[in-house]
Amino acid sequence: MLDLKNLQNNFDEVAKKLKNKKVDENILKKLAELFASLKKEKTALEEFQAFQNKFSKELATAEDKESLKAKLSENKSKINEQSVKVNALENELEEIAHAIPNIPDECVPVGEDEDENVELKKVLNPPSFDFTPKEHFELGESLNWLDFVRGVKISQSRFCVLKNEGALLSRALVNYMIDFNRSHGFEFVNVPFLVNGATMFGTGQLPKFKEDMYKVDDEDLYLISTSEIPVTNLYSGEILASETLPIKMTCYSACFRKEAGSAGRDTRGIIRQHQFEKVELVSITKPEQSDSVFNEMLECASDLLSSLGLAHRHLMLCTGDLGFSAAKTVDLEVWLPGQNKYREISSVSNCRDFQARRAKIRYKNEQGKNELVHTLNGSSLAVGRTLVAIMENYQDKEGKIHIPDALKKYF
């Protein structure tokens, strides 16, 4: 959640940045009106309270006690009425603020959509083939690695069954990713895949993205769309010791997404599924640590791709493509020969204090004051898309898939 004091004190500057993130101008105008109304009503409340405090002290020595009692009683009613007004405005303001995204960092390029993201660099060269490379779903069906028909039969569209070496390769990837991330200083944690609404709110999925979530009927439980949600919230409501920071964690989980806005996109294959697996990096830092830890996380995910021999590129997301909770995001896109283009395989984001304010995660700074931490997250990596990348990059003319050297000991 945004710092409402900063929003109120620097409204024009913040509003300009939020417009670049596609926040409706009418919502920003409504916020400005609410701030003005709240200031007016709070001033009135303070005046009533000041009257009550002053004359309550004088009641014992007042000549006309009954008259003063009546005035104090009337003023108390005004305080109660005014408190209701102030609380209503604060609740309305907070409700709107919950749906407003994070402010983009100064370094984030201004742009409308993914077409205006900025390429930062390429890592490794894509392989060359003396034949036309196939897409992963062709390879997967011919090798009996991917069973789309039975996935749809037991569930619905955008579900798939992994079989034989495809399932084994997926398992090997999970173990390799966890080991790789641990070797880079990230502690492995294993968390529930079902979390409550407060946890979903803490990382910014609720209330804005409620319709995209899978919810358990009659219970305050949601299936997670990323393990960033439970891992970040492990420390919700806590005040951490300064010396424990940064906390760097890695986690494997299944992820569940309705993909409501993806009709017609990636309808074949396992690029976009309702259920998929991911190994995540999550860090909790002091404010002054978050930029360096962001670079560590980005380097970890990029090095992981390089260790598998997968060509990829770094993209800085523009304001129009930036996620709700993120102040800055760099995507890693892996080269897919079958599609002849780069596709997203990881997003590394710095959320600054946006999630920490919602989840109430603080630490005691050197002055002994409680201060909000910064939270960061990133995929290292999306398992299904890494499987796709290996299938397409390591295929041969006969349609067989060769295993990267780094994974051989995991079979």
From Swiss-Prot:
Gene3D superfamilies: Bira Bifunctional Protein, Domain 2, Serine-tRNA synthetase, tRNA binding domain. GO terms for biological process: selenocysteine biosynthetic process; seryl-tRNA aminoacylation. Its EC number is 6.1.1.11. One of its GO terms (cellular component) is cytoplasm. L-serine binds at T226, S227, E228, E280, S379. It catalyses: tRNA(Ser) + L-serine + ATP = L-seryl-tRNA(Ser) + AMP + diphosphate + H(+); tRNA(Sec) + L-serine + ATP = L-seryl-tRNA(Sec) + AMP + diphosphate + H(+). Its main location: cytoplasm. ATP binds at R257, K258, E259, E344, I345, S346, S347. Keywords: Aminoacyl-tRNA synthetase, ATP-binding, Cytoplasm, Ligase, Nucleotide-binding, Protein biosynthesis. Pathway: Aminoacyl-tRNA biosynthesis; selenocysteinyl-tRNA(Sec) biosynthesis; L-seryl-tRNA(Sec) from L-serine and tRNA(Sec): step 1/1. One of its GO terms (molecular function) is serine-tRNA ligase activity. It is found in: Cytoplasm. InterPro entries: aa-tRNA-synt_IIb, aa-tRNA-synth_II, aa-tRNA-synth_II/BPL/LPL, Ser-tRNA-ligase_type_1, Ser-tRNA-synth_1_N, SerRS_1_N_sf, SerRS_core, tRNA-bd_arm. Catalyzes the attachment of serine to tRNA(Ser). Is also able to aminoacylate tRNA(Sec) with serine, to form the misacylated tRNA L-seryl-tRNA(Sec), which will be further converted into selenocysteinyl-tRNA(Sec). Belongs to the class-II aminoacyl-tRNA synthetase family. Type-1 seryl-tRNA synthetase subfamily. Consists of two distinct domains, a catalytic core and a N-terminal extension that is involved in tRNA binding. Homodimer. The tRNA molecule binds across the dimer. This is Serine--tRNA ligase. It comes from Campylobacter jejuni subsp. jejuni serotype O:6 (strain 81116 / NCTC 11828). The gene is serS.
